């Protein structure tokens, strides 16, 4: 096997007992690959390990976990200054793995690891909210956010992405739309939104294609708003992604401003952010990510 530069795997602490992963790493090490492993325990660990990775001179920092872990690692990478910033590799080990699935990362651990180490590094966009918090995949608001943030961890562990839908059906009687106003380049809308999706990536909530036209290297954010007076018909239309549905409003812009008369919550790659005013902007070519050659989210 050809020689490859060293990599550092930042592993979510929930995956430390993953025996197949341990075996895959040992096998690649036996084949001559240098793979450092660090385990996260609390918020801030990923940023410290990215700094350590730079001191070690590795070519790739691999995010081993779900969308939240990918978010933490990618955010730490774009905050690095100087040259020789490592590329991002992705090892999907979370509940839904929405970003990894949509960009075509293999499910098999050994194949995903090899791609993360030796795949072609391509410049991709990220998004930033209120000049502080970032997301690589999607910001979701309204119905979808309350479901994903409130779904019990045990239910997610047992059922994966389906758990979000089940929990949503159980909470139908308490869910209300969010009144807000959204502006962007050549875009303006105000009204009651049941679901808001602002995507750099395409899917969230365990596989739902909220922004099916999104690309991760086009310098744009895709917006989809689901409106309507009734939760269940709108949820069904969300699952079907019916392009002719009058309750679906779409837009594309390099930025969006959102204002609400009351506090609303957005879910940024799994992390909630609450407020009444949000400025969301794209950060073009913010980092390099090792992706498969047939990645469907590249233009």
Curated annotation (Swiss-Prot):
Binds 1 Mg(2+) ion per subunit. Ca(2+) may be able to substitute. Disulfide bonds: none annotated. Keywords: ATP-binding, Cytoplasm, Kinase, Lipid biosynthesis, Lipid metabolism, Magnesium, Metal-binding, Nucleotide-binding, Phospholipid biosynthesis, Phospholipid metabolism, Transferase. It comes from the Bacteria. The keyword Nucleotide-binding applies. Its EC number is 2.7.1.-. InterPro entries: ATP-NAD_kinase_N (IPR017438), Diacylglycerol/lipid_kinase (IPR005218), Diacylglycerol_kinase_cat_dom (IPR001206), Lip_kinase_YegS (IPR022433), Lipid_Phosphate_FormReg (IPR050187), NAD/diacylglycerol_kinase_sf (IPR016064), YegS/DAGK_C (IPR045540). GO terms for molecular function: ATP binding; lipid kinase activity; magnesium ion binding. It is found in: Cytoplasm. ATP binds at residues 40, 66-72, 95. Residues 2-133 form the DAGKc domain. Pfam families: DAGK_cat, YegS_C. It is an enzyme of class 2 (transferase). Its cofactor is Mg(2+); Ca(2+). GO terms for biological process: phospholipid biosynthetic process. Mg(2+) binds at residues 215, 218, 220. GO terms for cellular component: cytoplasm; plasma membrane. The active site is at 271 (proton acceptor). Probably phosphorylates lipids; the in vivo substrate is unknown. NCBIfam families: lip_kinase_YegS, PRK13054.1, YegS/Rv2252/BmrU family lipid kinase. Belongs to the diacylglycerol/lipid kinase family. YegS lipid kinase subfamily. HAMAP family: YegS. This is Probable lipid kinase YegS. It comes from Escherichia coli O1:K1 / APEC. The lineage of its organism: Bacteria, Pseudomonadati, Pseudomonadota, Gammaproteobacteria, Enterobacterales. The gene is yegS.
């Amino acid at each position: 096997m050809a020689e490859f530069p060293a990599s550092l795997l930042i592993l979510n602490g929930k995956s430390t007992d993953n025996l197949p992963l341990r075996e895959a790493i040992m096998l690649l090490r036996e084949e001559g690959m240098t793979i450092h492993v660090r385990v996260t325990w609390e918020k801030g660990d990923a940023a410290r390990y990215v700094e350590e990775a730079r001191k070690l001179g590795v070519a790739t920092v691999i995010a081993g976990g779900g969308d939240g872990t990918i978010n933490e690692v990618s955010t730490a990478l774009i905050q690095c200054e100087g040259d020789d910033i490592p590329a991002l590799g992705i090892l999907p080990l979370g509940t839904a793995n929405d970003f990894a699935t949509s960009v075509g990362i293999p499910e098999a651990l050994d194949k995903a690891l090899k791609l993360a180490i030796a795949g072609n590094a391509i410049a991709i966009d990220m998004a930033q909210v209120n000049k502080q918090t970032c997301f690589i995949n999607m910001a979701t608001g309204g119905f979808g956010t309350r479901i994903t943030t409130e779904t019990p961890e045990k239910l997610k562990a047992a059922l994966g992405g389906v758990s979000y839908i089940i929990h949503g059906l159980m909470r139908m009687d308490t869910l209300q739309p969010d009144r807000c106003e959204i502006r962007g380049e050549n875009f303006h809308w105000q009204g009651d939104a049941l679901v808001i999706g602002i995507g750099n990536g395409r899917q969230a909530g365990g596989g739902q294609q909220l922004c099916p036209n999104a690309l991760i290297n086009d310098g744009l954010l895709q917006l989809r708003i689901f409106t309507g007076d009734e939760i269940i018909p709108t949820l069904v239309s969300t699952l079907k992604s019916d392009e002719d549905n009058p309750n679906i409003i779409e837009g594309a812009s390099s930025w969006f401003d959102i204002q609400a008369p009351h506090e609303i919550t957005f879910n940024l790659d799994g992390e909630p952010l609450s407020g009444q005013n949000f400025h969301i902007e794209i950060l073009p070519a913010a980092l390099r990510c090792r992706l498969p050659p047939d990645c469907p989210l590249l233009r």
